[in-house]
């Protein structure tokens, strides 16, 4: 009986044990898979990448190339998250500047169609001017462009994936002014969203015609060029803990050893490093976020407890903040700006400053002194350019700033981002706001992935080693503008002067020979003179 009673339960226990082991292994596998998806899921997203060119100093913007019409005419367009229109100069414009490409020729495109309004009203509540639906756009700095609307085929060519093609209503410039007259890029690509009963924007049409993509786009810019990514963001670009490592040697951030070389578990370090900071958008159709503070050396320099509603704008070169906030930050930047390292009196005066002497005492005064001493020790000379903007020789010694978001998370804003490269110096890219509009511009975008999640109405930020695409690597095209230069303006003065001297001497010698010839003809006797006639 004992044997009979123990036999079956033993087999049942073994069976249950096997099932338990299988269940545990399955749960472990699912857990591992879940962790993998949480850290690597975004890398599985389908991403369409587009090269950006430009920089902050020379161009003051970043641009990409898009093909318009049939056959295609390439147009360079400034990437602008602060506006919604796609527009550029068209042939026949007499008030347009000289840009990278020839003005778009509607007659050369068999798919172009002007939006006329002679016999019917303009759609989207547009104005009818001289038989065409009017295009007009004003910008924060005061410039304005105007013309008429037309529609044509837009082809967006990805360097790593297939092209996306759709028909789009665009603006034809017939008048440009201010900055638009002198910019090198030909047009503007607005990246904000469509309003109800408004003209469908580029972003909405792109995702409508590429349903395989998530409705997320990312801007990742370095000192020279960068990328626009449609469909998500790229985890491979994210800065890993312990420093940053350039993407294919092209990044602009400080270079450090990789995670695997540091001896850490790459998966654990990745989870800690890959933390996208998300902030909800506060206005529909535009990319505004709430900023509650701006810290320098641990002290919030922002006076208002309400914070600021700031536009995340890739079309603005610099970050613009209220004047009182700017003055507080600038006071400490001025102290860190030592123009003459050999002036011992001036250097010692700065070193003897106490926290009590400041109108805004610093929470981390010791860090301020460390920064100042580091700048002095490394002889990080500073110069001032237009409007007193400080420029340092090196990045070393400059402080990190911290932007406080609505959830009180403090996001680091590093010197290699808020400073921009100008020749051999690094200049401050923060300015006083214009027209009471605070803006997070390109100096806030630089060296991070700025992720625009349209579906969830939020914007994400994460430090990144953004790829570099210098402008000289940009492919050439048949419709490039060929400047008809005055040849005399291209000749150096010495050669021009020499040509003038040679020309003058040639004219003078010609005159001399001409006069001599006249003299010879008038005063020299004819061969028959002085001789008697043959009959005589």
Swiss-Prot record:
Active-site annotation: 80, 313
Bias type Low complexity, positions: 244-258
PROSITE patterns membership: ASP_PROTEASE, PEPTIDASE_A1
Family annotation (InterPro entries): Aspartic_peptidase_A1, Aspartic_peptidase_AS, PEPTIDASE_A1, Peptidase_aspartic_dom_sf, Plasmepsin_5, TAXi_N
GO CC, any one term: endoplasmic reticulum membrane
Lumenal side: 35-492
Membrane-spanning parts: 493-513
Superkingdom assignment: Eukaryota
Residue ranges constituting the Peptidase A1 domain according to the UniProt record: 62-462
Function: During the asexual blood stage, plays an essential role in the export of several proteins into the host erythrocytes by cleaving the pentameric localization motif RxLxE/Q/D (termed Plasmodium export element (PEXEL)) located downstream of the N-terminal secretory signal sequence. Specifically, cleaves after the leucine residue in the RxLxE/Q/D (or RxLxxE) motif of exported proteins including EMP1. Also, by regulating protein export, plays an essential role in gametocyte development and thus parasite transmission to the mosquito vector.
Name listed for the protein in its UniProt record: Plasmepsin V
Origin species: Plasmodium vivax (strain Salvador I)
High-level lineage: Eukaryota, Sar, Alveolata, Apicomplexa, Aconoidasida
């Amino acid at each position: 009986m004992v044997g009979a009673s123990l036999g079956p339960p033993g087999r049942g226990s073994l069976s249950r044990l096997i099932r338990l082991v299988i269940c545990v292994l399955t749960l472990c596998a699912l857990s591992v898979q879940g962790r993998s998806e949480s850290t690597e899921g975004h890398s599985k997203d389908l991403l369409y990448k587009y090269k950006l060119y430009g920089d902050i100093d020379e161009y003051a913007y970043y641009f990409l190339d898009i093909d318009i019409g049939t056959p295609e005419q390439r147009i360079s367009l400034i990437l602008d998250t602060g506006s919604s229109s796609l527009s550029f100069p068209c042939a026949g414009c007499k008030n347009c500047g000289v840009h990278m490409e020839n003005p778009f020729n509607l007659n050369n495109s068999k798919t172009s169609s002007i939006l006329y309004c002679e016999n019917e009203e303009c759609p989207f509540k547009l104005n009818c001017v001289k038989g065409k639906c009017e295009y007009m756009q004003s910008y924060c700095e005061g410039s304005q462009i105007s013309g008429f609307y037309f529609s044509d085929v837009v082809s967006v060519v990805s360097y790593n994936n297939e092209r996306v093609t759709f028909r789009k209503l665009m603006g034809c410039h017939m008048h440009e002014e201010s900055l638009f007259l002198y910019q090198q890029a030909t047009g503007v690509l607005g990246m904000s969203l469509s309003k109800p009963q408004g003209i469908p924007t580029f972003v909405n049409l792109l995702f409508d015609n590429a349903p395989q993509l998530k409705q997320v786009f990312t801007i990742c810019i370095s000192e020279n060029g960068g990328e626009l990514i449609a469909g998500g963001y790229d985890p491979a670009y994210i800065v890993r803990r312990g420093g940053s490592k350039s993407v294919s040697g092209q990044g602009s951030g400080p270079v450090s050893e990789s995670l695997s070389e540091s001896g850490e578990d790459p998966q654990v370090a990745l989870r800690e490093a890959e933390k996208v900071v998300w902030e909800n958008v506060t206005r529909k159709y535009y990319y505004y976020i709430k900023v509650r503070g701006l810290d320098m050396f641990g002290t919030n320099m922002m006076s208002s407890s309400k914070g600021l509603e700031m536009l995340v704008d890739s079309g603005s070169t610099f970050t613009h903040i209220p004047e009182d906030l700017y003055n507080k930050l600038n006071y400490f930047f001025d102290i860190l700006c030592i123009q003459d390292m050999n002036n011992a009196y001036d250097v010692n005066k700065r070193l003897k400053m106490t926290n009590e002497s400041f109108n805004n005492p610093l929470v981390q005064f010791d860090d301020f002194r460390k920064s100042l001493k580091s700048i002095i020790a490394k002889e990080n000379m500073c110069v001032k350019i237009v409007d007193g903007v400080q420029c340092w020789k090196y990045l070393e010694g400059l402080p990190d700033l911290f932007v406080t978001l609505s959830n009180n998370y403090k996001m680091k804003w590093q010197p290699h981002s808020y400073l921009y490269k100008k020749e051999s110096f690094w200049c401050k890219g923060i300015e006083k706001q214009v027209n009471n509009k605070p803006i997070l511009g390109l100096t806030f975008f630089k060296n991070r992935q700025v992720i625009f999640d349209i579906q969830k109405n939020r914007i994400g930020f994460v430090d990144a080693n953004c790829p570099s695409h210098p402008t000289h690597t940009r492919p050439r095209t048949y419709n490039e503008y060929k400047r008809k230069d005055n040849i005399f303006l291209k000749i150096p003065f010495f050669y021009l002067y020499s040509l003038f001297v040679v020309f003058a001497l040639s004219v003078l010698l010609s005159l001399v020979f001409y006069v001599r010839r006249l003299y010879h003809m008038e005063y020299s006797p004819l061969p028959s003179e002085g001789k008697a006639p043959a009959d005589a």
